């Protein structure tokens, strides 16, 4: 069986950059690494992702959003994550069930027990062995996210970047609450410490937690 690592955090926390660095480090150590993301990771889930993140879909109600995430995850787990783990790979996933619990539960105030049941329905027995939470102040993360959008030279915003500051504060608090409840699974890393310092901290966690080849 492989090893499943998820990366979590607010918008603009630096997950994408750190996942790339982590994948390189693990491959150099001899691991077979699969990098994926949610929502998305396979064609059907990518189609759902486009609907979920499109800022034009502002009329989407929270329950619709939740069910779309669950549908995307069910396909992603069946098509990508479960097979890779069965083959012994280290799977790095940009967001997983914790994001749904935090964004739709803490952020949207949907029933968290219901979300947990849907997460179980979608993911089955797949659970992260390690979750790296990159934490940074909301203002910092949103500024980074805005810069990322500007760098694309497009006016297209993603739906979550249009949410209120209070929404994003609830999301951050939600992640920290989950981490506090499962300290054995979560490694909380300062995502406001610069790319290199953050990468070093992530590498230290991986060295201590991922089984060696």
UniProtKB/Swiss-Prot annotation:
Entry's Gene Ontology cellular component terms: cytoplasm; cytosol
BP GO annotations: dTDP biosynthetic process; dTTP biosynthetic process; dUDP biosynthetic process
NCBIfam families tied to this protein: DTMP_kinase (TIGR00041)
Source organism of the structure: Geobacter sulfurreducens (strain ATCC 51573 / DSM 12127 / PCA)
GO molecular function: ATP binding; dTMP kinase activity
The enzyme's E.C. designation: 2.7.4.9
Residues annotated as binding ATP: 9-16
Annotated protein name in UniProt: Thymidylate kinase
Family: Belongs to the thymidylate kinase family.
Organismal lineage: Bacteria, Pseudomonadati, Thermodesulfobacteriota, Desulfuromonadia, Geobacterales
Catalytic activity annotation: dTMP + ATP = dTDP + ADP
PANTHER family cross-referenced by the UniProt entry: THYMIDYLATE KINASE, UMP-CMP KINASE 2, MITOCHONDRIAL
UniProt function note: Phosphorylation of dTMP to form dTDP in both de novo and salvage pathways of dTTP synthesis.
Domain of life: Bacteria
S-S pairs: none
């Amino acid at each position: 069986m492989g090893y499943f690592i998820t990366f979590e955090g607010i918008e603009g926390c630096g997950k994408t950059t750190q996942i790339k660095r982590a994948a390189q480090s693990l491959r150099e150590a001899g691991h077979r690494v699969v990098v994926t993301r949610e929502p998305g990771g396979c064609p059907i889930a990518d189609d759902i992702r486009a609907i979920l993140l499109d800022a034009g879909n502002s009329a989407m109600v929270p329950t619709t959003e939740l069910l779309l995430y669950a549908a995307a995850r069910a396909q992603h787990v069946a098509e990508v994550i479960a097979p890779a783990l069965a083959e012994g790979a280290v799977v790095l996933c940009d967001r997983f069930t914790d994001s749904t619990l935090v964004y739709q539960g803490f952020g949207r105030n949907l029933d968290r027990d219901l979300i947990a049941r849907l997460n179980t329905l979608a993911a089955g027995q797949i659970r992260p062995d390690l979750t790296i939470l990159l934490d940074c102040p909301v203002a910092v993360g949103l500024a980074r996210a805005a810069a990322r959008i500007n760098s694309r030279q497009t006016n297209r915003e993603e739906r979550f970047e249009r949410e209120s500051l209070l929404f994003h504060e609830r999301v951050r608090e939600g992640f920290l609450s989950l981490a506090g409840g499962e300290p054995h699974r979560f490694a909380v890393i300062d995502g406001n410490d610069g790319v290199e310092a953050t990468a070093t901290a992530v590498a230290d966690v991986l060295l201590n937690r991922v089984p060696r080849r």
